[in-house]
Amino acid sequence: MTRIAVYPGSFDPLTFGHLDIAARAARLFDELHILVVHNPGKTPRFSSEERVELIRASLPEAARFGVSFPPSSQSKVVIDTLDGGLLADYCHRVGASVLVKGVRNGVDIDYEVPMARVNRDLAGVETVLIPADPQQGFVSSSLVKQVADLGGSVEKYVPSAVVRALRASAKNQ
């Protein structure tokens, strides 16, 4: 039986913390779907398609920063989008039995536990919470955007493709 998991997030933008959670999850499951989702509570900087491309461009670079994905023979990584509908429906459609969520602190856990219960009720999907690496646990996409918008260096927190995209978006604002 193939063990399929979904790692959902807005990934706006993708950070090394996101890549670390994805790589660790990919070692636990036969197939991992990194799913770019629309969060109605947020106004995205990048379109869903741009975020998918940034993730694709960043995967090869991940190893340079100590994030290693398992060989493709051991785990398949799929990058997809969900711009509408329920996450539970997506899980059912792709045959996923697990959601993967990264948690940085107690606030994240307080947010994720009720969501986990709803996803289990709606689709029978269990949620696995993976603690963030302490070196990346304080980094959020919002913080990265704020620092980049003010001209600060974010190279320690995001892959080079994301750095370039942030610089380009700052010029267009």
Regions found by a protein language model. Give the residues of each.
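Nucleotidyltransferase catalytic core that binds NTPs
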Residues: 1-173
